[in-house]
From Swiss-Prot:
Organism taxonomic ancestry: Eukaryota, Metazoa, Chordata, Craniata, Vertebrata
Encoding gene, per UniProt annotation: PTPN1
GO CC field: cytoplasm; cytoplasmic side of endoplasmic reticulum membrane; cytosol; early endosome; endoplasmic reticulum; endosome lumen; glutamatergic synapse; mitochondrial crista
Membrane-topology annotation of the record: Peripheral membrane protein
Main location: endoplasmic reticulum
Residue positions, PTM S-nitrosocysteine: 215
Annotated source species: Homo sapiens
Annotated consequence of substituting residue 50 to A/D: No phosphorylation
Record protein name field: Tyrosine-protein phosphatase non-receptor type 1
Family membership noted in the UniProt record: Belongs to the protein-tyrosine phosphatase family. Non-receptor class 1 subfamily.
């Protein structure tokens, strides 16, 4: 297959980063004026992940119709997707209002609520303990009917009720729970098995509204999911499956939402998934059983919230190159700590968060084409960290040490100055008396 040869050639030449940069430069750019309005600032998770004006989803609200979501219509594939950010605490009601108004049957979630100790998404669906959630701002009620937990994904059956009309609808929530915090899945097997589960449910069928797909920013993992699905669909529809050009398909999708596919690693993984998925499209039905076997979906799932590893304690008076900290100027140590923060393997997804704790700068293996975070701070801010109770801060200790060191010298200088001034005055007085 031509695509497989292309993949091997790119792998051999190590040119994934260059190809990814070409896509970034060729991608369409359209206005995002509505997203930038001051009143919508608290509805965006990231400053620089915004829906284009021409493709944004509009809520049926009179006061404000804005939600950070984009409609992607792939006409040849006859597939539509709504790509959106992970809901914020203040936009959960808007999220379900969009699902209701767009008549969507499926929601695909590709992140965990917490990753790397950061909140990636609000808990916008009810858990077993509570069973239901009511969104008063949009007058909707969501009830958990059942959930099927596998080793790497969970399928939830939800009931969404419009409290104004008393109408109810079934919503299927497909939650991929094991996308690694750093990078992409090792193998496309589990990803493809998950994708085909979504397909088999009918949630992607045109008789329903567009499937809603999200991660944290709604561009990286979400773009990977939609790109793989669209390419496999085009392979199935065309007489010549090898004519499908992944790069062209991605550029077409980027006309509807910015930044789809965030890293070269995600682009490479998309190729892998399409190449492997094409085996099923070409008639090898046994590969689906292989995906299921390789993905180990019947094993015990990992915990939902994995606490981040503790950060090492900061050094206070430890030796540094054979010398102690107290003999160095304080600002040198502050700079060192700030640099340590920068060197930590932090990642993620585009822009400074507005409504959540800062998300790290994602490496070339996660959702991060433009997302960034400010690490450290000004020197003054670093020195202003509160000391332990009852113990003076490090700058205060240094000041006391410096004062005790210079005190004898300063006293001697003062005495010498007074004696010199006195001698001069006596000389002037005696000189004037003689004249």
């Amino acid at each position: 297959m031509e695509m497989e040869k292309e993949f091997e050639q790119i792998d051999k030449s190590g040119s994934w980063a260059a190809i990814y940069q070409d896509i970034r430069h060729e991608a369409s750019d359209f206005p995002c004026r509505v997203a930038k309005l001051p009143k919508n600032k608290n509805r965006n998770r990231y400053r620089d992940v915004s829906p284009f004006d021409h493709s944004r989803i509009k809520l049926h609200q009179e006061d404000n119709d804005y939600i950070n979501a984009s409609l992607i219509k792939m006409e040849e594939a006859q597939r539509s997707y709504i790509l959106t950010q992970g809901p914020l605490p203040n936009t959960c009601g808007h999220f379900w209002e969009m699902v209701w108004e767009q008549k969507s049957r499926g929601v695909v979630m590709l992140n965990r609520v917490m990753e790397k100790g950061s909140l990636k998404c609000a808990q916008y669906w009810p858990q077993k303990e509570e069973k239901e959630m009511i969104f008063e701002d949009t007058n909707l009620k969501l009830t958990l009917i059942s959930e099927d937990i596998k080793s790497y994904y969970t399928v939830r059956q939800l009931e969404l009720e419009n409290l104004t009309t008393q109408e109810t609808r079934e919503i299927l929530h497909f939650h991929y729970t094991t996308w690694p915090d750093f990078g992409v899945p090792e193998s496309p097997a589990s990803f493809l098995n998950f994708l085909f589960k979504v397909r088999e449910s009918g949630s992607l069928s045109p008789e329903h509204g567009p499937v809603v797909v999200h991660c944290s920013a709604g561009i990286g993992r979400s773009g990977t999911f939609c790109l793989a699905d669209t390419c496999l669909l085009l392979m199935d529809k065309r007489k010549d499956p090898s004519s499908v050009d992944i790069k062209k398909v991605l550029l077409e999708m980027r006309k509807f939402r910015m930044g789809l596919i965030q890293t070269a690693d995600q682009l490479r993984f998309s190729y892998l998934a399409v190449i492997e998925g094409a085996k099923f499209i070409m008639g090898d039905s046994s590969v689906q059983d292989q995906w299921k076997e390789l993905s180990h979906e019947d094993l015990e799932p990992p915990p939902e919230h994995i606490p981040p590893p503790p950060r090492p304690p900061k050094r206070i008076l430890e030796p540094h190159n054979g010398k102690c900290r107290e003999f160095f100027p304080n600002h040198q140590w502050v700079k060192e700590e700030t640099q340590e923060d920068k060197d930590c393997p932090i990642k993620e997804e585009k822009g400074s968060p507005l409504n959540a704790a800062p998300y790290g700068i994602e490496s070339m293996s996660q959702d991060t084409e433009v997302r960034s975070r400010v690490v450290g701070g000004s020197l003054r801010g670093a020195q202003a960290a509160s000391p332990a109770k009852g113990e003076p801060s490090l700058p205060e200790k240094d000041e006391d040490h410096a004062l005790s060191y210079w005190k004898p010298f300063l006293v001697n200088m003062c005495v010498a100055t007074v004696l010199t001034a006195g001698a001069y005055l006596c000389y002037r007085f005696l000189f004037n008396s003689n004249t």
